[in-house]
Amino acid sequence: MSVYKPGIAPIKAQFLRTAWPARSEALDGSTETGADSEPTAFVPDDEPDGKPEQENPTDAAAPTTSSGANRAQDGEQDKPRKRARGQNKGRTFTRTEDNIALCTQIATGRDACKFGDSCKFTHDLCTYLEQKPRDIETPPHPVSSHECVRFVPADERDVYLATLYEHAVMQDTKRIKKNTDVTADAHPASGSTTPSAPTAPTTHDTVQASVVLGTTCPYFQERGTCPMGWKCRFLGAHVRRLSASCRVLGAEAQGMLGTGLELVEDEAKKHAWLHRSPYMRNEAQPESDQVNWLASDVARRLRSRKYTFDKAPAITSALRKEVDMLSAMTPAEAASTEVGKGPLRVNYEHERLVADPSATLEACEDALRNGGNDDAAADTARVRPCEKRRLQWKGDLYLAPLTTTGNLPFRRLCASFGSDIHCGEMGMAESFLQGHASEWSLVRRWEGERIFGTQVCGAKPELLVPTAEVLAREVGRGLDFVDVNCGCPIDLVYNKGAGSALLDHANKLGRIVRGMSEALGEIPLTIKLRTGTTSKPTTHKIFARAQTEWGVGGLSLHGRSRKQRYKNDADWAYIRTCVDTLHDAVRTWNEEPQHADEPDMVPVPVYGNGDVYGWRDYYDHLEHAHVDGTMIARGALIKPWIFTEIKERRDWDISSRERLDMIRQYASYGLTHWGSDTQGVNTTRRFLCEMLSFTHRYVPLGLLDHIPVRMNDRPPPFHGRDPLESLLSSPSAHDWVRISDMFLGPAPPDWHFTPKHRSNAYEQQG
């Protein structure tokens, strides 16, 4: 047994390598000859590079890797090279689309387009299919839901995993052969297949050459129909061949627009899909498995600044009046006054009349005299604190909001492993109010997410209060809570006064919380915090006021400061101090005589966050830090099955084939979320590579000298127990794209992926 060195994972000697290999090993056991990666020596970093994407909110930059061919000529091919350090900031990603833009109405199966000849897109379906890349080949899943394979009976699971692995080997072999065969066509009409593999029609028909009959479309297998229609990259799963195309038979060709093919649907699957019973159903679009869609007319009014806010102007006006009142007081008076504490009381009718130039003085006085109790509109009726939904979180597993990587397919993947509470990716308040489609897509909820909220980030009440109102009004039915980000450490956010900058401005944070809570109505508001902005922790002062003065519905605390980032271990002792501070504040509030006639206040749930990498960490923090639960971030990124380990209290030595099926599972979820057309496939590929940039850091338990292992322990170069395990552990982005090829087909020649960390660089070779 090796001696443990802090910061280095204790891998058994028989699995160690001197450097990461220059040529990746193929899944059939041979050495790949088409890779352009180089050997990399193990160089421990001072700071572990397991940072969530919140470190870098923009996704933009060009790849900067160079081919190893020139280095090989100079005799440098086999020399280990020190890994590049730092991040690729400002990354950019290419938008890959079809060479020919097919009309959407034609693509979905209509014989004609309502725009006729004036349509900007092509209606020539035969020409489109001739230029379309070959269908992607995938084996069928044992069940139609594409859920985690561990729910499949053992005998079926073993057969399926073997089939999946054979498919991966076949696709990998094809890719290597293509990379080494310089005379190969870019999109061959047919390729090498196993006896059980899907096959293209045995014809020289150029229209039908790209169709692979028998492949599996994730949409069609689950729902009995595919909304992508003819644009689907798995077209062979939902077409029927009637005859040859017009290129062979001319006018005698059958099928749609002379293709010799027709789209098909599975009525039994369609019926089963429409009669499913999810946690949250989209009543307006029962065929969709997602809720919280923003209506197009609402987005248009937001973009043109014509959206009417009923609550926000009155709330922000009331908050400004409180600021004026407090500024006129002495420090002693401000400390003892009730101004700025407790639920915000807003006279909406009076504020509306004051802002209306045509309102009479008598009407304003009547509204002021009535105290706003005679509300004419139901959506401005005040919700009392006791009417707010209380968060009953105790021991539920909370997947942290993760920018870029915490997308809907990843949350769905974690849900299949047992996560309970999900929070969407951080969205900026300004972008919500401007109606940006990319920002509003972050509030999208999969129908199977049991508890779901969205996270917003902003610097002042004038932005966050209107955001809270529009969220509550437009998608409030699909939100269980709204979270305010008070922990984002990146300079772009911090310098605007948002994120962790709010930790140094508690009074402003209090106004934000009270204003948003009023605008949200019955929806609870939570806040996500860090220990402070510098090495001196200050957040316990916020915990003393968060519930008793501001009425927050829940808190989560990351046990690191903004300055620390991920350089040191999370401070769970300080998390306990903050929890105890909140409990003491609630106890004191209940004992004060002025609150004797009010119901006793019950402490809201508090979740800790930081360095939870196994079930032992989870239960240890639950017991000693006095938290109601633990929020899991990097632990879920590196091994999404951590939720299963926690619930079953076991160390799961997951096999390489089970991990491969998890990747297949994510790809299926991505295709049903972003689409199975060319653009959707490559969007899925990009985010799959983002996920693999974290999951490759997992060190299989069977390779370790002892467990548990610490999250910040980085592994030296090692090989797995089989070629697939070695491939899944590769730190090279080249291999991540290679893995994506198994389920999403070969990456287009112009497609590239720039990893967040420079040490993982990859560039597609055309």
Curated annotation (Swiss-Prot):
Q: What does the record give as the active site?
A: C488
One matching Pfam family, short form?
Dus
Can you name one GO molecular function term for this protein?
tRNA-dihydrouridine47 synthase activity
Q: How is this protein annotated for GO cellular component?
A: cytoplasm; nucleus
User: What PANTHER family is this protein classified in?
Assistant: TRNA-DIHYDROURIDINE(47) SYNTHASE [NAD(P)(+)]-LIKE (PTHR45846:SF1)
Q: Which family does it belong to?
A: Belongs to the Dus family. Dus3 subfamily.
Q: Which UniProt keywords apply?
A: Cytoplasm, Flavoprotein, FMN, Metal-binding, mRNA processing, NAD, NADP, Nucleus, Oxidoreductase, Repeat, tRNA processing, Zinc, Zinc-finger
Cellular location(s): Cytoplasm; Nucleus
Residues binding FMN are: P401, L402, T403, Q455, K528, H558, N609, G610, D611, A633, R634
Protein's name in the database: tRNA-dihydrouridine(47) synthase [NAD(P)(+)]
Tell me which PROSITE patterns the record gives.
Answer: UPF0034, ZF_C3H1
Stretches for region Disordered: 17-93, 183-203
Q: Where is the composition biased (Low complexity)?
A: 188-203
Zinc fingers (C3H1-type) by residue: 97-126, 216-241
Q: Which reaction does it catalyse?
A: 5,6-dihydrouridine(47) in tRNA + NAD(+) = uridine(47) in tRNA + NADH + H(+); 5,6-dihydrouridine(47) in tRNA + NADP(+) = uridine(47) in tRNA + NADPH + H(+); a 5,6-dihydrouridine in mRNA + NAD(+) = a uridine in mRNA + NADH + H(+); a 5,6-dihydrouridine in mRNA + NADP(+) = a uridine in mRNA + NADPH + H(+)
Tell me its cofactors: FMN
Q: What is its main location?
A: cytoplasm
InterPro entries per record: Aldolase_TIM, DUS-like_FMN-bd, tRNA_hU_synthase_CS, Znf_CCCH
Q: Which CDD domains match?
A: DUS_like_FMN
Q: EC number(s)?
A: 1.3.1.89, 1.3.1.-
Q: What does this protein do?
A: Catalyzes the synthesis of dihydrouridine, a modified base found in the D-loop of most tRNAs. Specifically modifies U47 in cytoplasmic tRNAs. Catalyzes the synthesis of dihydrouridine in some mRNAs, thereby affecting their translation.
GO BP: any one term: mRNA processing
Which top EC class is given?
oxidoreductase
